Design a protein with these regions (language model features):
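N-terminal amphipathic alpha-helix/helix-capping segment at the start of soluble metabolic enzymes
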Residues: 1-3, 59
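Glycine-rich, proline-tolerant flexible connector loops at the mouths of alpha/beta enzymes
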Residues: 31-56, 109-117
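Hydrophobic faces of well-ordered beta-strands that scaffold small-molecule active sites
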Residues: 3-7, 28-32, 66-71, 105-107, ...
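Residue-level "edge-of-site" marker
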Residues: 9, 35, 72, 110, ...
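Glycoside hydrolase catalytic-domain groove-lining segments
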Residues: 185-190
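Short polar catalytic/cofactor-binding loops
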Residues: 7-14
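Catalytic domains of carbohydrate-active enzymes, especially glycoside hydrolases
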Residues: 16-36, 100-101
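Active-site acidic/histidine proton-transfer and metal-coordination neighborhood
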Residues: 16-20, 53-54, 58-62, 75-176, ...
Length: 190
């Protein structure tokens, strides 16, 4: 069994220290979100191939597997500029993953909490973004994943199944946190 952690739960750490900290805590694998994980990275625009290589080398040295490279973007946003930036950033992370070797690059499909009408409006934009990203993942031969969240256009497992059927790609995976598809996850489910 591997013990994994979200690296940003440890706060932002120096690139040369994070993997060692995880190892000292008994962590074997990680979900890594670059701007949330490292003091040297304020945004994806600051990430260079040299930084990616430093991260890879430090995690490899400590024996920590990067299972998920998180790149949480607003993939369904109807604003063309916002969505283009989101897709371009996710594509960068797909390319970074060739070096980092994470199992998947993952994202939710929106930032804000959307009502049912907004989810319907955002849905075709989300589909367009996912199609572009699947094409890039296939080109690079890496895997990507989307995560259903009740408040987002990818709101439930039925919608996820429809997306997977439409995309029909072995490079598209799913991150599933059951609490994220509940309208009120704080309610006792017993």
């Amino acid at each position: 069994m591997l013990v994994a952690a979200r690296t940003h739960d440890y706060g932002k750490q120096p690139i040369d220290s994070l993997a060692g900290l995880l190892k000292s805590e008994g962590i074997d694998a990680a979900q890594l979100v670059l701007p949330k994980g490292f003091t040297e990275i304020g945004s994806y625009d600051e990430v260079t191939p040299e930084i990616i290589e430093r991260i890879r080398a430090n995690f490899e040295k400590e024996g920590i597997k990067i299972h998920i490279l998180g790149c949480y973007m607003d993939l369904g946003n109807p604003d063309d500029d916002v969505r283009k930036q989101a897709v371009d950033t996710f594509k960068k992370c797909l390319a970074f993953n060739k070096t980092l070797g994470a199992s998947i690059v993952g994202s939710e499909t929106a930032y804000p909490r959307l009502n049912d009408e907004e989810k319907k409006i955002w849905h075709p934009y989300m589909m367009d973004s996912i199609a572009r990203l699947v094409e890039e993942a296939e080109r690079l031969d890496v895997d990507m994943a989307v995560e259903p969240v009740y408040w987002h256009p990818l709101k439930d497992l039925e919608t996820a199944a429809m997306v997977f059927e439409k995309m029909n790609s072995s490079h598209l995976k799913m991150i599933f946190d059951p609490a994220n598809v509940l309208e009120h996850p704080e309610i006792d489910q017993d």
